[in-house]
């Protein structure tokens, strides 16, 4: 994949940070900290501050708790990386460069996750979201699409995708299904 394509897509991209506080709840089975969703962004980096369990991912229809490790980051691939497919090393603008090989168009998948609360202890986390420039067209990289590897997603301007994502109810996997191309010749669609 052309390095210039990566720079154009992610250089001067958007970055946001969110601090999450989940207070203790005496009846945790009756509430949810954050409903099930996948992240709209390209990449999410999460630090679970007080080592309290609460983040869960969905695998094969089952919710699996993510056990916090001291001083460790959790990296989530977001919907935009699932849509764009290319093979390259990307340097993200953090204190140290995060080299990350991105190979997607559904080869790497954004993950459905949620946060649950604890009956006795609060949970704290900080999430950093990194994404493309908002005025960029997102979709499978043209150099990756071929007769054998058909596009699984349509292209859309990043701003329109983000607007659509936030306009919907935060429920289930993702807004990504809106972009999915129904293609009978492509069994992975």
Describe the residue ranges of each PLM region:
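C-terminal flanking tails of non-heme Fe-dependent oxygenases
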Residues: 1-189
């Amino acid at each position: 994949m052309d390095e210039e394509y990566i720079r154009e897509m992610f250089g001067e991209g958007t970055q946001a940070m969110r601090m999450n506080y989940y207070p203790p709840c005496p009846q945790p089975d009756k509430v949810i900290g954050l409903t099930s969703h996948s992240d709209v962004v390209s990449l999410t980096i999460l630090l679970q501050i007080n080592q309290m369990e609460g983040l869960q991912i969905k695998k094969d229809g089952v919710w699996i708790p993510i056990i916090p490790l001291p001083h460790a980051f959790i990296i989530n691939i977001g919907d935009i990386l699932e849509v764009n497919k290319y093979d390259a090393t990307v340097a993200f603008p953090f204190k140290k460069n995060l080299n990350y090989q991105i190979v997607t168009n559904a080869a790497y998948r954004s993950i459905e996750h949620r946060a649950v609360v604890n009956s006795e202890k609060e949970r704290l986390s900080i999430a950093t979201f990194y994404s493309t420039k908002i005025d960029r067209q997102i979709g499978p990289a043209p150099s990756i699409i071929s007769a054998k590897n058909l596009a699984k997603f349509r292209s859309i301007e990043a701003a329109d995708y983000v607007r659509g994502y936030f306009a919907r109810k935060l429920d289930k996997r993702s807004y990504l299904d809106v972009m999915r191309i129904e293609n009978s010749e492509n069994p992975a669609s």
